[in-house]
Regions:
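GIY-YIG nuclease catalytic motif and its immediate N-terminal context
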Residues: 1-49, 81-84, 88-91, 95
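N-terminal intrinsically disordered, low-complexity tails enriched in polar/charged
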Residues: 1-6, 102, 113-114
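Aromatic/basic micro-patches that form nucleic-acid/chromatin recognition or nuclease catalytic surfaces
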Residues: 42-45, 49, 54-113
Length: 114
């Protein structure tokens, strides 16, 4: 199965309203955006729709991240399209999700990832 990473821009109010998000991003100076980085076996667009609709799978598990459901604005393909050109396994996508999130933090973004 092919996996991809994706980036969602979050409303900036997540930084003031969510203490965990704020604590995870002490470097954030308010200049750049707040982002969520994830990985999926779906297309990024399908996954974003799942987040925004509070998708629950057949087993009854909620698959949407609360932070994206509440604060997610839109996908930022310019930040991830170049990574998804190469097919990734689940393990590779998990590693890439963390690398991308930490790289975006170093650039000055406030980032949430799992």
């Amino acid at each position: 199965m092919r996996y991809q990473v994706y980036v969602v821009e979050l409303a900036k109010r997540v930084f003031t309203e969510n203490a965990k998000f704020r604590a995870a991003n002490p470097q954030f100076n308010g200049v750049l955006e707040c982002l969520y980085v994830g990985m999926t076996s779906k297309t990024p667009k399908e996954r974003f729709t799942q987040h925004k609709t509070g998708y629950v799978n057949k087993k009854g598990h909620k698959l949407s991240a609360n932070i994206v459901q509440k604060y997610g604005s839109y996908l930022r393909p310019s930040l991830y399209d170049h990574i998804n050109l190469k097919a990734m396994t689940r393990q590779q996508a998990l590693i890439m999700e963390e690398r991308l999130a930490l790289d975006l933090r170093r650039q000055g973004y406030a980032v949430w990832f799992n």
